[in-house]
Amino acid sequence: MNYEQGGSGTEPSEGFNLRVSVGILVRVIFKNPENEKIMLALERTSTSIKSEGKSRVVVRTKPFGGGARILNPNELMNLIGDFHYDSGRSQEESDFRILVNPGNWEKILVVCREHLSGKRVGVIDFSPVRELTEEFQDSLHIQLRSQDYSLTPRGMRIEDELTPTENVNAPGFPTKRIYILYDAWLKSSVLMKMIMANSSKYSDANLEEMACEDAKKGGKGRANAMLSVSLNQLLDFYRSVQHDGKESPMLFMGHQLEWNVRALLELSDE
């Protein structure tokens, strides 16, 4: 493929055939107020998608968090070499989902480690606060406060084996991934009870109906809720199943868990 050189735009030049995704995953955990068991909270999103004149609804159960943000693309280019965003949307939102020359992979790791250690600042935003706040608002319709939880960095997970992405903006592109991991321990018993009540109230089928109804009313065709599960129960299940290394979801208690949930579960084994 020959593409016109475009700096840090969205049109890749020849040789820019590695997609790198840097994401933030937050393990939201709390003690069940009734029995003291450790619970894991996950986000459930339901989206109505139109394709070829037909509509379908996709329900995803995934960790809280989102993409790391590039704060200073020019400085990042000085550090890792030229790059291109994987899509116009990633560029608009400054998401760290980029196409690079494979030879610059190690430079990206260095920059990420420097930001985690505090040696370098101002190039990448690894804070999970914005995403957490938005996702709690979407699911529970509340304003998450800093005093409601304590945030602990858990390091960086590197997935340097190439796998094709299922991201709709760059489907099938060979991708390496970096995850910045955090624990968010909830402090508010009121919030814990709200999460568990929300999890029990809405089934995945309910979320599908809500997304369809939202689309009919002219909305974006979306609905959000939470899922709270026993962390130990989910860990036992995860350890009992075979993993093929692909981006394949897991079916747990009738819920399809996104493949990146495993990054949170493997934290418990460290």
Segments and roles (model prediction):
Residues 1-270:
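N-terminal leader/linker segments that precede catalytic domains of diphosphate-processing enzymes
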